[in-house]
Amino acid sequence: MPRIPTAEVPKEVLDYLFDEFDIWAKIHDGRLISEPIDGLPSSTWPNATAMIIKHFLPDGKHIATTHCVKDDSGHVFHWDTKDLRLHDVRLWRA
């Protein structure tokens, strides 16, 4: 499968689009299916795991990727945007 066109955008733009399209709300209320990729120990926070998480629509289409660092109790130390797919274009955080 060919790679989709990708445009680098500043973090502020990607954060704005996540807010504008309610991506965070959709992640938290379960409207998007979230699948973490195997995590690694965090280099910043002891006893925490850093994960890349892919977020999908119910039909299986990948629409966003985030980076999350949390501990075993579920406390989130850091969670930010990585990319957003709009139609057939990927917006990647520069």
Segments from the language model and where they lie:
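Catalytic toxin/effector domains delivered as secreted proteins or via bacterial secretion systems
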Residues: 1-94
